[in-house]
Amino acid sequence: KSVLDLCAAPGGKTMQLCAAGAKVTAVDHSPQRMERLRENLVRQGFTAQLVLSDASDLSVCSGFDCVLLDAPCSATGTLRRHPELAWIKDVGSIYSLAIEQRKLLLAAARYVRPGGELVYCTCSLEQEEGEEQVSGFLRTHRNFRVNPIMLACEGVEEDMITPQGFLRTLPCMTAGASQGMDGF
């Protein structure tokens, strides 16, 4: 499977995709973060095509079986580990991030081959950055649909699936982890 990993650095998901046998093209706009991704790939013995570019303007990339967009976000899902976020994030910053996420999501859709998959995720608890982002996208892109998360997927529990079929984890959930998990 060919996978385009947008906003890929530092590369955790890139390496998981490589380990699963995918042919990965990893994109990030930051030279420093891309170098960290490259180092991580080398250290783990994986290879991927690395593209230093803004994810919203990749004229040479198209026709991927799957496009993964882990969009820049408020990171409110990491409150369990970073409680200070509750005091430093404001509505204005979330609104600005939502605008950027929308641009990236629209761009990501252009890189998916017909019949391919687009995976959108953030580590935010904010509806504006998650479910509302996807719902708004689907209203204007009728050729895309939600593939509901199945309980048969490893590690997925019933309370993690929203009525719309989205996967939503919260810091209060444990799913076998003794110290909880991040919100996604």
List each language-model region with its residue ranges.
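S-adenosylmethionine
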Residues: K1-F184
